[in-house]
Curated annotation (Swiss-Prot):
GO terms, biological process: tRNA modification
Domain MTTase N-terminal: from-to ranges: 10-120
Catalyzed reaction equations: L-aspartate(89)-[ribosomal protein uS12]-hydrogen + (sulfur carrier)-SH + AH2 + 2 S-adenosyl-L-methionine = 3-methylsulfanyl-L-aspartate(89)-[ribosomal protein uS12]-hydrogen + (sulfur carrier)-H + 5'-deoxyadenosine + L-methionine + A + S-adenosyl-L-homocysteine + 2 H(+)
Cofactor binding remark: Binds 2 [4Fe-4S] clusters. One cluster is coordinated with 3 cysteines and an exchangeable S-adenosyl-L-methionine.
Record's keyword terms, sorted: 4Fe-4S, Cytoplasm, Iron, Iron-sulfur, Metal-binding, S-adenosyl-L-methionine, Transferase
Protein name, entry field: Ribosomal protein uS12 methylthiotransferase RimO
Membrane-spanning residues: none
Segments forming domain TRAM: 382-448
NCBIfam families referenced in this protein's UniProt entry, alphabetically: 30S ribosomal protein S12 methylthiotransferase RimO (TIGR01125), MiaB/RimO family radical SAM methylthiotransferase (TIGR00089)
SMART domains: Elp3
């Protein structure tokens, strides 16, 4: 007769807030938890401990994080806090003194030490063989975020990221490429390259290290962004770049896009167009030069999609400054644009600047900005009608098929609604050809 002993692994609840960079941190912590034998559950009720990975970028994010911590304490009582807001331990303790432990962002080892302290590591681990080679992922199986560096060396006056996440710290190129290959080998069709400042990759390293030859897959490579992108382009997946600061060497990425090595998509946070406002933000700013570069980029790669973000209502922004921004939008004809009303952030230099813009003026400028950009976006999407585009499928239900074109990043851009008239077998993650038949200011419609 055989006797089987039951095994119950400790349960860990997990709450992940914030941006894609924080999501990558959550994925790494979850991977280590599973590797150590813990069971991850989606509820507070049966959790032996709850981890809350917080965001602290703007005040509304801080409030959301504090509320999430409070909810976890109320529902469970045993809470460890990590993430960006964790860098402000006193602020958390003032509101939630019963939190067990607090760590800052990307403090993976410290988080695991705290978990082991309150919920000892299981002696027997039935999950080791179940942890996939690419680690635990919180995104759908067909796309994943690839974080290439941590921190930021810029001192933008509206931002506190350097104080939360530290100075720029680039990952070794072979480590990034190894992770990317594991992801693609696991079935990932699209890699979204993220960091606080993607175009600064490897600039924190000495010239000697940047020029040092290393080997990956038997090929000699250098440690820089262009080489990284060129090698990523050999993996057979869509490679999409986010958070690209407009350094001069970004120009060298455009030929790779024209050659089809990486997606013709550039996410560049320009923030404003008024030289005065840009100077106050401590952002680089020659509008004429930016426009010249955009024109050149489009000449080299006509299919290029440009996404950017802007801030309206920054302290000292006058109507003249705002009009410069509108004029820039009209001339630049950007494809995808996000706009934020300036929000004071504790610890940011701009929070204490003179000439704060009244909230009603911010709102009015936001509405005017969005109205103009919606017209521009609609006009640019109209130009896609009649074309046949590759579309990656994100969702299939009784209402139809939803995907994204090369011009659409998940969560932040538009989608493509697909009518499967051919009734061909289509699965989530497939990349199919779609004939575009209609468009509005955000989305496309088409048939396959």
């Amino acid at each position: 007769m055989r006797y089987f002993m039951s095994y119950s692994a400790p349960n860990i609840g997990f709450v992940s807030l914030g941006c894609p960079k924080n999501l990558v941190d959550s994925e790494r912590i979850l991977t280590e938890l599973r590797t150590d034998g813990y069971n991850i559950i989606p509820t507070y009720e049966n959790a032996d401990l709850v981890i809350v990975n917080t965001c602290g970028f703007i005040d509304s994010a801080v409030q959301e994080s504090l509320e999430a911590i409070g909810e976890a304490l109320e529902e469970n009582g045993k809470v460890i806090v990590t993430g960006c807001l964790g860098a402000k331990e006193n602020q958390i303790r003032e509101v939630h003194p019963k939190v067990l432990e607090i760590t800052g962002p990307h403090s993976y080892e410290a988080v695991m030490e705290h978990v082991h302290k309150y919920v000892p590591r299981p002696e027997r681990n039935p999950y080791t063989s179940l942890v996939p080679a690419q680690g635990v992922k919180l995104t759908p199986k067909h796309y994943a975020y690839l974080k290439i560096s941590e921190g930021c060396d810029h001192k933008c006056t509206f931002c506190i990221i350097p104080s939360l996440r530290g100075d720029l710290d680039s990952r070794p190129i072979t480590q990034v490429l190894d992770e990317a290959k594991r992801l693609v080998d696991s079935g990932v069709k699209e890699l979204l390259v993220v960091s606080q400042d993607t175009s600064a990759y490897a600039l924190d390293q000495s010239k000697e290290n940047q020029n040092k030859t290393v080997f990956w897959n038997g090929a000699p490579i250098k440690n820089n962004l262009i080489t990284l992108c060129r090698q990523l382009g050999t993996l057979g997946a869509w490679i999409r770049l986010h958070y690209v600061y407009p350094y001069p060497h970004v120009d060298d990425l455009i030929p790779l896009m024209a050659e089809g090595k990486i997606l013709p998509y550039l996410d560049i946070p320009l923030q404003h167009a008024s030289p005065k406002v840009l100077k106050a933000m401590k952002r680089p700013g020659s509008v004429e030069r930016v426009l010249e570069r955009i024109q050149k980029w489009r000449e080299i790669c006509p299919e290029l999609t440009l996404r950017s973000t802007f801030i309206v209502g920054f302290p000292g922004e006058t109507e003249e400054d705002f009009q410069m921004l509108l004029d820039f939008l009209q001339e630049a004809q950007l494809d995808r644009v996000g706009c934020f009303k300036f929000s004071p952030v504790e610890g940011a230099v701009a929070t204490d600047m003179a000439d704060q813009v009244p909230e009603e003026v911010k709102e009015q400028r936001f509405q005017r900005f969005m109205e103009l950009q919606q017209q521009i976006s609609a006009q640019r999407l109209q130009q896609k009608i009649g074309k046949t585009l590759p579309v990656i499928i994100d969702d299939i239900d009784e209402d139809g098929i939803i995907g994204r074109s090369m011009a659409d990043a998940p969560e932040i851009d538009g989608v493509v609604y697909v009518d499967n008239r051919s009734e061909s077998a289509v699965k989530i993650g497939d990349i199919i050809q779609v004939a575009i038949t209609n468009a509005d200011e955000y989305d496309l419609w088409g048939t396959c």
